């Protein structure tokens, strides 16, 4: 857990279920127009089914997309899947103001997921060779960030109770044969996505040494 940084609270926005592209565009607009006084924000969302291809993505890792749309995006990393039953947390953080290194933010995101899973009795770990969070040899959370104008966007996606079949249509994050898992298969009493999303936001805030302020309005 990080020490309290003395920064203002992070605004917590719950977006519900949204298509990917409008949320991505809203993240970019927020990042491009924010200034030194703009609040940091966490966005919690579930996306409609979509494959997103990161800047390092290769076409050969997209095996059989079928009817699921493919979006070439500007985050780091390679291809992944988003869909209902998966909690996505986007940390829109002024990393310069917070004196936060990219590796530090990545580690905070991974540790937040690890802490959440530990609270439910699941042992998980990060891997130095493949960003994300793993339970044994299976992947439960994917991670991809972008830093622009000294601020972060994109984030982390945690599989809670969604359909994992679409992951078989890709090489997740560029790793052929990567097995995926989800929280509902690892615990006897799995919370719903909304509860897990709030837990994840709280875990990440603790890692960053920040407080959260829930917001009634959504930014996108």
Curated annotation (Swiss-Prot):
CDD domains: LipB (cd16444). Pfam families: LplA-B_cat. The active site is at residue 173. It catalyses: octanoyl-[ACP] + L-lysyl-[protein] = N(6)-octanoyl-L-lysyl-[protein] + holo-[ACP] + H(+). Substrate binds at residues 75-82, 142-144, 155-157. The record marks 139 as: Lowers pKa of active site Cys. Its EC number is 2.3.1.181. One of its GO terms (biological process) is protein modification process. GO terms for molecular function: lipoyl(octanoyl) transferase activity. Belongs to the LipB family. This is Octanoyltransferase.
């Amino acid at each position: 857990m990080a020490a309290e940084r003395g920064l203002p609270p992070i605004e917590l926005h719950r977006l519900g279920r949204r298509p990917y592209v409008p949320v991505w565009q809203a993240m970019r607009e927020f990042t491009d127009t924010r200034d030194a006084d703009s609040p940091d924000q966490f966005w919690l969302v579930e996306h409609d089914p979509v494959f997103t291809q990161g800047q390092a993505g290769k076409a050969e890792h997209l095996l059989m997309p079928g009817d699921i749309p493919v979006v070439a995006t500007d985050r780091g990393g390679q291809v992944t899947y988003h869909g209902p039953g998966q909690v996505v947390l986007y940390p829109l953080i002024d990393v310069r103001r917070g004196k936060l290194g990219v590796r530090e933010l990545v580690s905070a995101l991974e540790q937040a997921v690890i802490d959440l899973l530990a609270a439910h009795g699941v042992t998980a770990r990060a891997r130095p060779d493949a960003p994300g969070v793993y339970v044994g040899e299976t992947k439960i959370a994917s991670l991809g960030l972008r830093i622009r104008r000294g601020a972060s966007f994109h984030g982390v996606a945690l599989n809670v109770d969604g359909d994992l079949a679409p992951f078989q249509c890709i090489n997740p994050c560029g790793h052929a044969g990567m097995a995926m898992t989800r929280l509902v298969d690892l615990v006897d009493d799995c919370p719903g996505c909304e509860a897990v999303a709030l837990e994840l936001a709280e875990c990440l805030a603790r890692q960053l040494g920040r407080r959260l302020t829930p917001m009634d309005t959504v930014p996108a």
